[in-house]
């Protein structure tokens, strides 16, 4: 059994830069982007790209998974710096941005699936874990309702993302996210008349 050696610092920077450029390029230009163009924009040679990602599908898959990891891994930093309800609202903005990127990469991701890959295998679990962490923090602080399931919130977020997918509707997405967060707050008991 072989173990992967950690990348040298320069190799890690090159890999990270390739992933960043790939997300932007595939999101903007779709599947027509050449790997040569990705390598050139990343400031590396095509051989460096192929050392990290032997196929186009490997690059697309890694870029998608990297974006998912960045989104989910941001939860701890958000909770460290913001009250839980604000951390959730900020994360929800990032989710909408993430789904916009994913849609832009749609054709490239379909090619990964057609070649036998499954870029979505870990998405649901990672997203559910991230949302559960945010909800539990807000519930513990008393700023979010205790009866909200992470899966339900993800469905709501996905619906908002689909309904406001164009950049022109991004402002509307923000307003809808505000409404969703307001619905997550604990209900105030009103004395009966």
Predicted features along the sequence, with ranges:
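Basic, helix-initiating cap at the start of DNA-binding domains
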Residues: 1-41, 58-61
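Hydrophobic alpha-helical connector segments
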Residues: 62, 73-101, 116-119
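Amphipathic alpha-helical packing segments from all-alpha helical-bundle domains
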Residues: 69, 101, 115-143, 148-151, ...
């Amino acid at each position: 059994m072989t173990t992967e050696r950690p990348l040298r610092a320069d190799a890690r920077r090159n890999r990270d830069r390739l992933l960043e450029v790939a997300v932007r390029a595939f999101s903007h230009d779709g599947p027509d982007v050449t790997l040569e163009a990705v390598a050139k924009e990343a400031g590396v040679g095509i051989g460096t790209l192929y050392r990290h990602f032997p196929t186009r599908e490997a690059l697309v898959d890694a870029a998608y998974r990297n974006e998912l990891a960045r989104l989910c891994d941001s939860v701890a930093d958000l909770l460290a710096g913001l009250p839980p309800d604000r951390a959730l609202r900020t994360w929800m903005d990032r989710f909408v941005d993430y789904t916009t990127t994913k849609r832009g990469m749609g054709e490239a991701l379909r090619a990964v699936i057609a070649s036998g890959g499954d870029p979505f295998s870990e998405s649901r679990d990672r997203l559910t874990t991230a949302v559960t962490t945010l909800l539990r923090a807000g519930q513990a602080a008393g700023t979010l309702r205790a009866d909200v399931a992470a899966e339900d919130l993800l469905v709501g977020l996905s619906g908002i993302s689909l309904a406001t997918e164009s950049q022109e509707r991004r402002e509307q997405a923000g307003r809808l996210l505000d409404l969703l967060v307001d619905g997550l707050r604990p209900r105030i008991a009103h004395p009966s008349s």
